[in-house]
Amino acid sequence: PVLQTLRGHRDSLQAVKISPNGKWLASGGYDQTIKLWDLETGQELRTLLGHNGAVFDLSFRADSRLLASASGDRTIKLWDVATGQRLDTLNQSLMELYCVAFSPDGRRLAAGGVDNRIRIWTISDSGQEGSNPLEVSQFAHELPVLRIAYAPDGQTLVSSSEDRLIKIWNAQSMTIRSTLAEQADWVVGLAVHPRQPSLLAGRLDGTITRLDLPAPATATDTPLTPLSDVVTAMDYGAQPALEELPRVTESEPNDEASQPTALTVPGVALGVIQTADGRAKDEDLWAFEARQGDQWIIETNARRLKSPVDTKIEVLDESGKAVPRLLLRAVRDSEIEFRSMDSNQRGVRLKYWEELLLNDYVYLNGEVIKHYQQRRGPDADGQFYPENGNRHAFFDTTCRTHALGEPAYVVVPYPVGTTLPNNGLPVFTLNYENDDDGQRKLGADSRLTFVAPATGKYLVRVSDVRGFAGADYRYELIVRRPRPDFTVTLTGANPTVNAGSGKEFTVKAERADLFAGPIQVDVTGLPPGFHVTSPVVIQPGLHEARGVISAAADAPAPTEANWAQTKITATGRWGDKTIVKEVNSLGTIKLGPKPKVLVHLQLDQPANALAERAPQEPAVVTIVPGRRASCRLRIERLEFKDRVQLEVFNLPHGVIVEDIGLNGVLIPEEQTERTIFLSCEPWVPAMERLFHAVAKVDGDQVSLPLQIRVVSPTEPVR
């Protein structure tokens, strides 16, 4: 029998859910409202307003305190059930959202819709705005996602789609466990049995079926191990200089796999791309022997010798087939927005930019780039490696020009032969080949790092990428062992440091041949009254770091003899070897008068925020990966009344200052301080690092440093 009929909506209903405590019912539909009802009395308790589109789905958290709603306005909203207050709006989706579900423990929230993705957020206990970060954005189906449901143990997530497929996911890693047989019609209702490994699926044709739910422990739950973009260099001992390597001249014909010119490696091959005997083009093949795991740097020297040839190199097997290097599995799709991207620029605007994490790889028509810095807002570009200069390409791909609207894919690299479950997006195979050096050191000449997958004979094919040829199209092909190394250069020498303030300097590393480890720069022997942040550490894979030289308010003017005592060294490790290099000096540093504005970077704690510490004993701000911390910027206005723009530098890669906009941090006129929030990406390793603030006025005055301590979630925060 019908117990109650609840009336109140002005249009058709799309979602009705009962709270876990059995007290309330929530309903939503095309009238863009959500209504909460008392189940016992049938009385309407309150109407939740805020959506600008139809409400398609609802989900209560297990404690019945929070309600989540999915809407055609492209947002998920979190609501306080007791008060009806909107707590947060999750707006990462660019298309309509059809479904939403809390995990059984209430810590995660999953949603899906028209853009074929399943997004998962980590939900705080309060659900307040800013405390519910996006954790996962997973391309899930080739057509819109209609329904999602968690298994009671929280280990399994089930999704259905307009592609008529039901997919079973590992809820933690979002890897596919299995894909069930194609259904007769769209599955618009899903429910996982509370005690048995099965689920009920309701189809659009009015039929309901019971399906077996695969057990959680399956082979596909084994985590896939991605590859690094840097090969761990092997130590081959002392290597001959380039001019000492044996040289061999090509012997034509050598265009076919059966006709290569033999090359003893390490060695240098001398060739010419020229046509003869009526051939339309010329390709030179060189043969060399390698053992499994052997590492070789293969590069050309042509444009640097003023040759017109634009080389391309490819590594082939003995039969002439391309040797695959790795697999790139697409996990999210995107595209270039706003404007095209040339082959040099680091900045680009990509669709779904808020889902792009730092260090994500993006595949663009054969080029692989790596995300370095998130966009500072919708009107800014996302930045890709390196920190400065022209864009780098990874895995020895070549930088190219990309058109507006060109498809892009966030990809994860895996070894050749890895079994990758189908997720509806492509898997790209990268071969050992290169046109222009992706690290931008050789100009239009080619370079790649080859690691032999098996013992045997390999071929290197050299050609002109344009198909041109001529008698003067000469080149050198160099095959040599890696020689990991680095040099460090200091910029910002010879500054004038104002009394009681500081000036910034930068140390830049030039890395060579697979050297990717940290580089520690130490500064010793400063004059009395001066202090420098030391050591300054260039993080693994990065190319620069910043430090501060400060002068005490009562520092005496230094002499040239004082600065002659200052020494700067850079130290790095490769395997069991320690490499020490001298760095150019700070130069002659002058002591300037007290500046018009002083900058202070302090803990965000009223009890000790104003307490100044000695430069060698900086205060410590502690942060946990995946969370936030705060600190305070304070300025002393001595003779400066205008607004002050500030930047915070030398934070660990993966820790950013939130919500700073295009112009950095601003302290308006008549104000002297501002609290800033630091956000730490989940993958940032434990470390300690000095960072500082720079006021972009009065000669760029710099604060004394704070120390940031990144700790693991299990380590106590001190």
Cite the ranges covered by each PLM segment.
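WD40/WD-repeat beta-propeller blade N-cap
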Residues: R7-L13, L49-V55, N91-L97, Q138-V145, ...
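Conserved strand-to-loop turn within each blade of WD40 beta-propeller repeats
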Residues: G28-D31, A70-D73, G112-D115, S160-D163, ...
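Short loop/turn segments that connect beta-strands within beta-propeller blades
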Residues: L39-G42, V81-G84, I123-S126, A171-M174, ...
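WD40-repeat beta-propellers
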Residues: P1, I34-W37, I76-W79, I118-T122, ...
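Residue-level detector of Asp-centered blade-edge/turn motifs that repeat once per structural unit
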Residues: P20-N21, A62-D63, P104-D105, P152-D153, ...
